[in-house]
Structures are given as C-alpha cells and as structure tokens.
C-alpha cells in the first residue's frame, strides 16, 4: 500500500473525493477497510491517540461486540476505557489513561497493522486536517514517532490531507521535517467547466428538470468553478 498526501483549500472537495475513492476501492476488495479520522477539533496527542484507536477499531469491527473484544485483545500494556451508548449502531468510545499511553504509544500507533495482520485485512487510514498535528506540544518529536511507526507498516496505507497549504507544505516538503517524502503529493484543483456542466445536467435530470448549456456555463462562471458553491 502506498501513502498519499492531498492539499487543497476547504470546500474544494477533498473529503468527497476521498470518500468516493474509498467506496469504490472497498467495492473491489472485500478485505479492504477504510478508517476516516478528522483532526479539525483535535489539539493534543492524548485526543489523537484515543481517536485513532476508536476509529481503527470501528473500521475493522462489524458489530459492537466485536469492537469491544478488539479493544480488549489488541492491547498488552494499555487498559482501554470502553463506553457503549444506548444506540448499538454508534461507535464504541475508547479512552486511555494518558500516563499509560505516554509509556506505551506503540500499542496505539501499531494497532491498525496488528489488526490487519491478524485478520488478513488491508487498511487505509484517511486523516483530514492532518496539518493540525503541527500545533501539538513538541510537534517535531510527535511527528518523528508517527513516521517511525507508520513507515514500517506493510498492511496499512495512509491518506493524509489538509486545507492549510503552508502548514501542509511545511510538514511534507521541508527536508528537515519527519514526514518529508512520506507519500505521493497531490494538489487538488478546481473542477473543470465541462465536468461541472455535466454535474448540473445530472442533478437537474434527477428531479425531472433540465438546464440549458448556456445557463449551466453561466453558473460555473459565477461560482468561479468552486465545487462547494457549485453544489
């Protein structure tokens, strides 16, 4: 599995692109699991580790009983605090004692690889607003730890994307940073006019209506090919 980095402003369709690609990929491979993580509101390592563990277990478990069993069986030194809501369709919430995590971060960072190897799966971890890790306490040390683990994973790939270009560029293109050349770097552009016109035609058709080409082109021009406003 290869690693991919995507950079573009908010509202340009990164998440939609990743979700669509994930859906198509899983339709072709029954052994593939996609884990989605959003770091928009994550401001420290403690929250990151809990969220990573929770999302990985959710993505690799078909029901909450399996999620609870995975949460217990794949940790040797950490004792996860498991919370189950009244709705069994919701994810199992996982938390740890922060002092234990600081002593044993490997167990969380290698969790996806362990599960993938044990269950014969391939896992892709998609992390939105990845540049937020640059705001953690001692970010370079944290990034070194992430890179040292993630680069060794054989059954897990990473799709890391974000909207703050200068911060993402600093993380991935600065040769002194741990994530330098971690994966294939992509810059997402605005959608070309013909594709947006086709999109308008399709959406109008879905509701039993139609739109002429000139009107569709005018809308594209007015929103400056911006995917969010085009919707």
Positions of PLM-derived features:
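P-loop NTPase nucleotide-binding core
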Residues: 2-4, 8, 12, 16-123, ...
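Conserved nucleotide-binding/hydrolysis micro-motifs of P-loop NTPases
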Residues: 11, 40-45, 130-132, 163-167, ...
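Short, glycine/charged-enriched secondary-structure capping and boundary segments
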Residues: 21, 50-53, 139-142, 173-177, ...
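Surface-exposed cleft-lining segments at the edges of enzyme active sites
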Residues: 94-100, 131-134, 203-204
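Sensor-1/coupling segment of RecA-like P-loop NTPase cores
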Residues: 117-126, 132-138, 145-176
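Helix-loop-helix "sensor" segment of P-loop NTPases
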Residues: 170-221
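The conserved phosphate-sensing helix
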Residues: 223-231
